[in-house]
Amino acid sequence: MYKRQVRNTPLAQFIKNYSFFSYSANEALHLSEQERRTIIDCMCKIREELLHPIDKHTKSLITDNIKLLLDYCERFYDRQFETRENVNLDILARFEQTLDDYLASNLPISKGTPTVQYCADKLCLSANYLSDLLKKETGVSALKHIQQKMLDIAKERVFDVTKSISEISYELGFPYPQHFSRWFKKMVGVTPNEYRQNRNN
């Protein structure tokens, strides 16, 4: 019953924004004693409302307290990201190396363009945790990091006139040259051929 009530509240819309629900067990939240007491206090309030006879305030009080609990969890995860700076920098370096290795290999031809999930798996992290960590450290999501890395490489290879645009597109993991051209134009503002011609001019 309460599950149905929550589903029909604003909380149901907000809850998908809490990306930590997709974190894996090794990315669990490590609470200080004060943080632990805050979480327990929130849970006790929710429990009290669940045990209280239902009235017109029940629904809003339960959902408001759940949202408060989730907001505290988000705050404490932000703190955890900030206090693990050395670990985070190591993950960033390994993420960059994973991307470099992937794009320098033949994997794009067989597996396609690199994905956040692929990189996260290689780093033994969940995709959401990796993306959140990168966003906290650099201001840019994992997907945007991948896109920028691919664009830098694409620009370099487009200037190599010994390769056709089709060859370059396959090397980067695009199944069709048209897909690569559309992506390149979206990122740069001109097609690969136009970019190559502008350089030669």
Task: Locate each region found by the language model.
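A short, Lys/Arg-enriched amphipathic alpha-helix from helix-turn-helix/homeodomain DNA-binding modules
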Residues: E85-L125, K144-K163
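Append "Primarily bacterial transcriptional regulators
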Residues: Y118-L125, L130, L134, I168-P175, ...
